[in-house]
Amino acid sequence: MAKEKFERTKPHVNVGTIGHVDHGKTTLTAAIATVLAAKFGGAAKKYDEIDAAPEEKARGITINTAHVEYETANRHYAHVDCPGHADYVKNMITGAAQMDGAILVCSAADGPMPQTREHILLARQVGVPYIIVFLNKCDMVDDAELLELVEMEVRELLSKYEFPGDDTPIIKGSAKLALEGDKGELGEVAIMNLADALDTYIPTPERAVDGTFLMPVEDVFSISGRGTVVTGRIERGVIKVGEEIEIVGIRPTVKTTCTGVEMFRKLLDQGQAGDNVGLLLRGTKREDVERGQVLCKPGSIKPHTHFTGEVYILSKDEGGRHTPFFNNYRPQFYFRTTDVTGSIELPQDKEMVMPGDNVSITVKLIAPIAMEEGLRFAIREGGRTVGAGVVAKILD
């Protein structure tokens, strides 16, 4: 059968389930897909199909992730669910599955548990902008006061990690009842309430093409009689012929003008997010630009050397290091298109980092990189990946 054409009539939003092991993330994922498929069309998913998440690779790291799609009246959602805690850590840090918002699943019977806290912290560190809470297994709790207590605990935990705990939507329900076809308040009604919260609480994300222009430099050529051409894939925004741009990172920032946009050897008036292009730069010498820099809208992004990051260090089985590393470890940090050496400062209570750990670190690079919070990077030793990370906070 021919693949059906993807009709994009509704805005698209990426979400995912997070929370403690056995609190019902996968059951809820199945329940959402099943209830919404019956209401708005789409494919219902069984628990087993989601639980048997296929392996995929992101930045050389193997992650098990299940991808489920569903629709509401207003939107199309792509939803990720991971079977194991380690998969969540890797997924969130590598940005393999970018989330515009997360559904935190918390069992009403147990309340917040260690991974509940850890996933909220991770969401904060990697820049997941919105969290909605699904208080699951409410059918197992008869005491209304107990429910209220759990809700309060969850709100406090969210506030502790700088999410708006008091204003976060909390939906009470039972994913199991909903999946079994229960039409009551805790069943189907709760899922519809959750869908409504997704639609109203998570804003429609900005499309890449609407962002400010940014293109990582992949290659630089000099074409006699025309000048210097820089090639790369436009990450976001639009570049028009005649616009002023900046070259940022590694060396002092310089301004130049884009005098031509080429794609597949054709001249264009403009290039936009997703295009692989060559940009002709006025008065720029070939030796003035190098891989690892970015071209961007003037003033939109600054070069930095000092930042905190959340990192996952590959285990030995994943092809990572066989031994721990200590304070002042100096690997290469691969940002976008190039490696820059940097030194790692560990948190005070952490003497060493073992392969397979995730940890918050402070990094000082030997050369500045065009950087924003949320930027992903790989940690490498002699060209092989030993870790993955995300910029949590820029220090200077």
From Swiss-Prot:
It catalyses: GTP + H2O = GDP + phosphate + H(+). InterPro entries: EF-Tu_GTP-bd, EF-Tu_GTPase, EFTu-like_2, EFTU_2, G_TR_CS, P-loop_NTPase, Small_GTP-bd, T_Tr_GTP-bd_dom. Residues 136-139 are annotated as: G4. Its main location: cytoplasm. One of its GO terms (molecular function) is guanosine tetraphosphate binding. Residues 174-176 are annotated as: G5. Residues 10-206 form the tr-type G domain. Residues 60-64 are annotated as: G2. Keywords: Cytoplasm, Elongation factor, GTP-binding, Hydrolase, Magnesium, Metal-binding, Nucleotide-binding, Protein biosynthesis. Residues 19-26 are annotated as: G1. GO terms for cellular component: cytoplasm. It is found in: Cytoplasm. It comes from the Bacteria. Residues 81-84 are annotated as: G3. Mg(2+) binds at residue 26. Belongs to the TRAFAC class translation factor GTPase superfamily. Classic translation factor GTPase family. EF-Tu/EF-1A subfamily. GTP hydrolase that promotes the GTP-dependent binding of aminoacyl-tRNA to the A-site of ribosomes during protein biosynthesis. Monomer. This is Elongation factor Tu. It comes from Cupriavidus metallidurans (strain ATCC 43123 / DSM 2839 / NBRC 102507 / CH34). The lineage of its organism: Bacteria, Pseudomonadati, Pseudomonadota, Betaproteobacteria, Burkholderiales. The gene is tuf1.
